[in-house]
């Protein structure tokens, strides 16, 4: 099924910026888009400039190799024929491959000790979107019609775990000395768990992927306000980076925006009816985190390491946070059900 058959097209933009403080950009991003297909990746490296840059590049290259080859050879039928489950498996396998490459690279070079990266990505096919995620970069769904924003991914950070357990508030988390510490990232160990999410998109929806250089300075409702104020993803992405930099730009900042448009509304409705959609958000299959581990300091200093073992059990499917629903794996998708998201004022 080609893009004309679905009645959908995607408009996209991708930007990354060093920020106002850092000398190097350890973020790597990638965006491939054609008609109603897109693959977007944000990876935020850590462990020092050279190590972080290399780790995030490895993550991006591994995923590109997994899914772009068929498209580069014009094999759209292959991409259309792939099941969502197969796509998810390919993306997860690519992340695990990248993780092993990073671990091996660090073990072979003492100067790269502590290297690692986050990775957040989405593969879009028409109105289908499949996300895979490790770390604290984020994916958001912004509903243009009803003006709300939903955080799709869960941060794998120490402070978010403390918030979820009721030990600290969101406000305290923003000032916590361990706010930059992750309990899961590529490069920590040979094995890695990957979160997988699936949702359906509608015309007018925007997907936004970003590194924490954006969310450190810009609140979710502000992100949505900027994105919805401009129909051009390129201008919206530029405005978000400018806003983050105007507020200090303490970290590298990366933004990818994907806007869903209906080129043939009637054809789109026919395809959606035929697909018998149920707007379901699929949360990670293994919701219990037994232990939290990381070798990453608040300053990304590989010599200043932290290991957090067996702090508490955490049910990942019930992480409440700004702009993110806290429903069970069978709950209606918050993006279209009216629950659990930041709503913007009209106008």
Model-derived features with residue positions:
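PP2C/PPM-type serine/threonine phosphatase catalytic domain
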Residues: 1-347
């Amino acid at each position: 099924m080609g893009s004309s058959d679905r009645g959908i097209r995607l408009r996209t933009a991708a930007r990354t910026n060093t920020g106002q403080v850092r000398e190097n950009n350890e973020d790597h991003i990638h965006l491939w888009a054609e008609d109603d297909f897109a693959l977007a990746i944000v990876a935020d490296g850590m462990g020092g400039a050279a190590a972080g840059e290399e780790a995030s590049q490895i993550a991006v290259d591994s995923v590109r190799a997994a899914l772009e080859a068929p498209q580069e050879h014009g094999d759209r039928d292959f991409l259309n024929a792939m099941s969502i489950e197969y796509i998810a498996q390919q993306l997860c396998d690519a992340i695990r491959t990248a993780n092993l490459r990073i671990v091996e690279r660090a073990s072979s070079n003492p100067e790269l000790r502590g290297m690692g990266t986050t990775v957040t990505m989405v593969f879009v096919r028409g109105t289908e979107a499949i996300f895979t995620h490790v770390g604290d970069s984020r994916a958001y769904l912004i509903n243009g019609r009803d003006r709300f924003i939903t955080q799709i991914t869960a941060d794998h950070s120490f402070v978010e775990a403390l918030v979820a357990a009721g030990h600290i508030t969101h406000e305290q988390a923003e000032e916590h000395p361990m706010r930059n510490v992750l309990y899961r990232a590529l490069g920590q160990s040979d094995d890695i768990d990957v979160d997988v999410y699936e949702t359906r998109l509608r015309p007018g929806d925007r997907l936004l992927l970003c590194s924490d250089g954006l969310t450190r300075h810009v609140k979710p409702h502000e992100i949505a306000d900027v994105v919805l104020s401009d129909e051009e993803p390129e201008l919206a992405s530029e405005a978000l980076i400018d806003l983050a930099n105007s507020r200090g730009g303490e970290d590298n900042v990366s933004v990818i925006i994907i806007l869903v448009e209906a080129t043939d509304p009637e054809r789109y409705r026919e395809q959606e009816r035929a697909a018998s959609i149920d707007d379901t958000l699929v949360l990670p299959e293994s919701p219990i985190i037994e232990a939290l581990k990381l070798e990453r300091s608040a300053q990304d200093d590989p010599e200043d390491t932290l290991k957090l073992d067996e702090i508490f059990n955490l049910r990942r499917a019930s992480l409440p946070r700004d702009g993110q629903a806290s429903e069970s794996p069978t709950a209606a998708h918050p993006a279209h059900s009216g629950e659990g998201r930041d709503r913007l004022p009209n106008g």
